From Swiss-Prot:
Residues 11-100 form the ABM domain. Keywords: Antibiotic biosynthesis, Oxidoreductase. This is Tetracenomycin-F1 monooxygenase. Pathway: Antibiotic biosynthesis; tetracenomycin C biosynthesis. Its EC number is 1.13.12.21. Homotrimer. It catalyses: tetracenomycin F1 + O2 = tetracenomycin D3 + H2O + H(+). InterPro entries: ABM_dom, Dimeric_a/b-barrel. Inhibited by p-chloromercuribenzoic acid, N-ethylmaleimide and diethyl pyrocarbonate. The lineage of its organism: Bacteria, Bacillati, Actinomycetota, Actinomycetes, Kitasatosporales.
Length: 112
């Protein structure tokens, strides 16, 4: 499950992929498959969630890693270079490295 907590111990990435609407689901499916097959099994992986913008022009990945070093090691893994090449060929990735400062949940089941 996704972890969203204001923990300074986690490295958080929000990656917004600008994409043509006809490629949105194809890119999402690719990201999900690579995460399932490789990324989630790598040291330091905590969680990843994928979101589709309603206008069809973005895929958003919210991911957390145990540390920036773990994230950088994943990014340098040669097995993932074809994945990164594919993403750049069909989209315009914009990685945003974040610090979670606040996270709120519903106060009652009705709000959930």
């Amino acid at each position: 499950m996704a972890t969203i907590s204001p923990s300074p111990d986690l490295f958080t990435l929000v990656n917004v992929f600008g994409v043509a609407p006809e490629k949105q689901r194809e890119l999402r499916d690719h990201l999900v498959q690579v995460t399932e097959d490789l990324i989630r099994h790598m040291p330091g992986f905590v969680s990843a969630t994928f979101h589709l913008s309603r206008d069809g022009e973005q895929v958003v990945n919210y991911a957390q890693w145990r540390s920036e070093a773990d994230f950088r090691a994943m990014h340098a893994d040669p097995r993932l270079q074809p994945h990164f090449d594919y993403c750049r060929s069909v989209s315009r990735p914009k990685p945003i490295f974040c610090e979670v400062t606040h996270s709120f949940g519903a106060t009652s089941p009705e709000g959930a």
